[in-house]
């Protein structure tokens, strides 16, 4: 397989090496949360034998603005195709990385997920995780990364 030059900051490397199933990363703006998430999406996608990996932002527009170009840049050597209209990237192993908006939860029902990133989870309804995405991870015992900027006490804090 093509070599990817995964370059991480020391704090990102600690998170990367942590085997916990559900990671929560609360960090300030411009610290590298999204870049870490992009690398995780690519590597987890390459390791998926079935199912997909999702990146979920509060809206699909935010998902595109935050993650699309970064995934195309970092994953270029292992991307078989990309479709900006539906925000999906097909990797060379056949796995799909899909970018979704939590404001349209119906588009995320009925899938089997290997990995999931929820970005700015504090800006989403908790039901999106509890009723839709958590069950989508169950059959594969998939993992998830919650990232966001601290905003007081809410469901992301909990």
Where are these regions (language model features)?
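Phosphate/NTP-binding elements of NTP-utilizing enzymes
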Residues: 1-158
